[in-house]
Amino acid sequence: VGPDAGWGRWDATILRAADELYHDSFLSDATWMTLTKRYDTQQLIDVIFTGAEYIMLSMMANSFGVQPDARWAARLPTDVPRRIGAARATPLRLERARLEPIPVDEWSDEVRRLLDPNGTGRPALNLYMTLARHPTFYRPRAVQSAYIRTGSTLAGRVREILILRIGWLCGAEYEWAQHVRAGRREGLTDEEMQRIALGARAPGWDPFEAALVRAADELHRDDTITLATWDELAARYSEQELIDVVVTVAGYRMVSMALNSLGAQLEPDRERFPNIGSR
């Protein structure tokens, strides 16, 4: 039923955090402040990524049509309506970080091995320097991220279209700013990146790339890809590529939730969202 169904204050806060991550890709100030009264930095990061991880897994299970084992059928309540609140029309962007990046001169040896394994002495991105406050979490998360960015079966152009679209939908300006650069390296033009923000119906897409943008939209809105869009992608893509489409969108929705909720601030030389109106 949700956080207002007679829970104690703490349990209701945890449920509300899950709702806010799902609806808004963002933890409200009220929820964040309540969590900070009991949780340390690493636990706060774990709250965000636990909720985000299972949203990601739900998107994958729904899109692939994974059927529950027979013994699990009775676990999902069938007599409770699934109430989904409307997301904010304009996602919020925090003007200051909730968790600050670790300054370079405060890096421990462990953090230095994570963020600067080659000993360059240069600072890492603000997101990485923030997540490094939880080294135990950082290591496996970096492996997942590296797969999407460098090991995926998808062409770089396709990967960046999907990442930019989900970043735009989630209001994750930091994610957009980083991947505008990556998109240009993969051959995306400024006009095409503006078209990504406008969506699948924007003039100029070829049918297949429009289907990719639509897949990101459907995953964001419904946690699944419609059969029509799936069939359109499957006409060209292998099973591995179809999996990577969902993994890319779901993985970067997770990143968006963290960026927004932690208040990761843009580096000074990064581009902001294009000014094209509402999502």
Regions found by a protein language model. Give the residues of each.
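Hydrophobic alpha-helical segments
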Residues: 1-279
